């Protein structure tokens, strides 16, 4: 039942974003898609599980600030134990030649499934990713993240995860409206 609720929520979020994207009708849109896999809660032998995730970033919404170049991100992950995390937040990107350092912070909704009980529906993911440019439109990366409810619940065990990711940037295309 929890997996059904998670998948329904995931569908509604992506449907909402796709409708809004069509309404915006941005002609020169750079979009970044990130697919990743790894180990959820690798530091807990009893509850570690493989994970698969997807993340989206609209490059047109980047903003230069005193913290660097910030942009909004939205994504979801699911574990082999049918736990899921649906999130949206912000990331910064720092380029050092072909090396990219990308910290991010994303509040989200965690669905336990048959996975680890993190103590609350609302969880916060802090992540640090290192990636290398493969070309001007793709990257290969490694990241570490921690998901925690910041003591919103009665318990707050947290989960430490690592992932390997592939990122692809779509370049602007001329749209026929």
Residue ranges and their predicted role:
Residues 1-27:
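Cleavable N-terminal export/targeting peptides
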Residues 167-173:
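Conserved small/polar residues in nucleotide/adenosyl-binding loops
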Residues 57-61, 93-97, 131-133, 169:
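Structural signature of outer-membrane beta-barrel channels/translocons
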Residues 22-30, 44-45, 60-70, 95-101, ...:
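Short loop/turn motifs that connect adjacent beta-strands in outer-membrane beta-barrel proteins
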Residues 32-41, 67-79, 102-109, 143-148:
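Transmembrane beta-strand segments that form the barrel wall of outer-membrane beta-barrel proteins
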Residues 50-54, 70, 84-90, 124-128, ...:
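Hydrophobic, lipid-facing positions within transmembrane beta-strands of outer-membrane proteins
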Residues 102-124:
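Mid-chain, well-packed structural core segment of small domains
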Residues 40-50, 76-87, 114-121, 151-159:
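Solvent-exposed loop/turn segments connecting transmembrane beta-strands
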């Amino acid at each position: 039942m929890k997996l059904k609720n998670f998948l329904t929520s995931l569908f509604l979020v992506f449907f909402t974003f796709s409708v809004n994207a069509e309404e915006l009708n941005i002609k020169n849109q750079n979009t970044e898609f990130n697919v990743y896999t790894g180990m959820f809660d690798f530091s807990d032998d009893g509850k570690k599980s493989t994970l698969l995730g997807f993340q989206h970033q609209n490059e047109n919404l980047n903003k230069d600030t005193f913290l660097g170049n910030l942009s909004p991100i939205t994504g979801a992950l699911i574990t082999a134990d049918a736990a899921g995390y649906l999130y949206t937040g912000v990331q910064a990107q720092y380029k050092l030649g072909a090396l990219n350092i990308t910290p991010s912070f994303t509040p989200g909704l965690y669905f336990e499934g048959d996975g680890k009980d993190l103590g609350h529906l609302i969880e916060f993911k802090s992540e640090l990713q290192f990636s290398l440019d493969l070309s001007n439109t793709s990257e290969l990366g490694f990241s570490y993240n921690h998901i925690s409810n910041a003591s919103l619940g009665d318990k707050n065990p947290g989960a430490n995860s690592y992932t390997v990711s592939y990122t692809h940037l779509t370049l602007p295309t001329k749209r026929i409206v």
